[in-house]
Amino acid sequence: VTGSAVLVLSGCSGKSEQTEKTLRVGVITYSQDDPFINGLTDELKVQLKAMENKQRRIIVSTKSGNDDQQEQNEKVEEMIDAGCDVLCINLVDRTAPSRIIRMARNEDIPVIFFNREPVREDLMQWEKLYYVGCDAEQSGIMQGEIAAEYINSHPKVDKNEDGKIQYVLLEGEAGHQDAISRT
């Protein structure tokens, strides 16, 4: 989905000469130490590479914010200075995208936020801001339904046969809005 959005948005960039032959995509993640985010980034690269053709070359550059919003802001600025046509950003702090938005808007570069949704007010600041992610609440409901189905079809799960299931709930990344919504 993010790969398709990148191609659609490449036509929204204020840059005209380069986008006809080469599309430069900047991907900036919150951390390089997160296997899930690394997997998403790798898959994005694969999908974008598959969308190349004789008329369009796609160059993907990646950087990490190293769990520091200020550092991520600097990496975004570097990507803008390097001539990126579209930015894909996995925010360090979902409540602090204002500087990134301002820099991108000043250069008319569309931004696709992914995995960490900025607050609604920030997304409404400019028409070239987008979010790609899951419906975390729906994911939580689906997880609960899967657990209930398993428990109902496997009565031995109730180890002490008291009609109650004791369990440990692992929330995921502390403070991540999707992890909170799922649980």
Residue ranges and their predicted role:
Residues 12-183:
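A residue-level marker of the well-folded mature domains of exported/periplasmic proteins
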